[in-house]
From Swiss-Prot:
Name of the molecule in the record: Holliday junction branch migration complex subunit RuvA
Region annotation (Domain III) ranges: 154-204
CDD domains, alphabetized: UBA_RuvA_C
Region Domain II, annotated ranges: 65-143
Family: Belongs to the RuvA family.
Entry text on domains: Has three domains with a flexible linker between the domains II and III and assumes an 'L' shape. Domain III is highly mobile and contacts RuvB.
Origin species: Magnetococcus marinus (strain ATCC BAA-1437 / JCM 17883 / MC-1)
Amino acid sequence: MIAQLKGSLAAKHPDHVVMDVHGVGYRVFISLATYNELPTVGEACLLYTVTHVREDAFLLYGFHSESQRKVFNLLTSVNGIGTKLALAALSSHTPEALLTALSREDLTLLCTIPGVGKKTAQRMAMELKDKLGALPMAAPTTAIGAATMAANPAGLREEVASALLNLGYKPPQVDAALAKLFSAGEITDISVALKGALKLLAPA
């Protein structure tokens, strides 16, 4: 099992990165929260990873902090919660907010995760409530060289839309949010665009 990767950031996108470790490129799937903490391409980077082995694929999931990885593992232990949904949860909320919601059985917050309805939220709270006390939460340890990369304005809207669709938001929701976001003024940074879009998509 690969527990962490330390090397240079060869490429980054809202849903995955390529890490160059001694000349070997590893494709690693990430949350938007981790994306927002990444350094610029070419700089040193550390990701805490989870390895998933399937019959047809060897998949890596990376996180900028230990707490993100712990909550990812916790969420994927729930029956019916896959890696995509766990990444969506970590893209929408901090690990601390998710743990608080689970411990308090806050279904309202859990239902704001893309793809999570009331029944899924109830199952998450029921299956995980007893496990929370055994989950130590260390102080956040972030990826090496954290920085924000300015995106290419020409492809910014398309990249943000792709990231939101991958999280489970519906095309009409994404189109409406991005139309409102970009009509408010010029945005040239993808991190700013993603945060703004997620805020607009969050239930009032």
